[in-house]
Amino acid sequence: MFLLYEYDIFWAFLLISSVIPILAFLLSGILAPIRKDPEKLSSYESGIEPIGDAWLQFRIRYYMFALVFVVFDVETVFLYPWAMSFDVLGVSVFIEALIFVLILIVGLVYAWRKGALEWS
């Protein structure tokens, strides 16, 4: 039989972690002064007055490099729990993780061949 009371702490944590940001957002909207001064609308660059145009275009290679990084960073998030419980899960989960890693290696080779990892 599935017992829901075992998850009471989870639901309480989920509720509290959802309510706190919503309350903070609402309170900041209520308490913050609403002014449209030119100083408020100007861009802020680490305490230095902005020189020139603040909007710059980034080259697509930075985007591709960041995208490849995010993909392999998420891979680590998925593989860590598997590695921690490897001895309990058995051979079938090992084969599934191996297929997952092989798919990611194929993606890495594809990104490498397309030049997503090159800076020049």
Curated annotation (Swiss-Prot):
Its main location: plastid. The gene is ndhC. Signal peptide: none annotated. It comes from Fagopyrum esculentum subsp. ancestrale (Wild buckwheat). One of its GO terms (molecular function) is NADH dehydrogenase (ubiquinone) activity. The keyword NADP applies. Keywords: Chloroplast, Membrane, NAD, NADP, Plastid, Plastoquinone, Quinone, Thylakoid, Translocase, Transmembrane, Transmembrane helix, Transport. It catalyses: a plastoquinone + NADH + (n+1) H(+)(in) = a plastoquinol + NAD(+) + n H(+)(out); a plastoquinone + NADPH + (n+1) H(+)(in) = a plastoquinol + NADP(+) + n H(+)(out). NDH is composed of at least 16 different subunits, 5 of which are encoded in the nucleus. This is NAD(P)H-quinone oxidoreductase subunit 3, chloroplastic. Belongs to the complex I subunit 3 family. It is found in: Plastid, Chloroplast thylakoid membrane. It is a multi-pass membrane protein. GO terms for biological process: photosynthesis, light reaction.
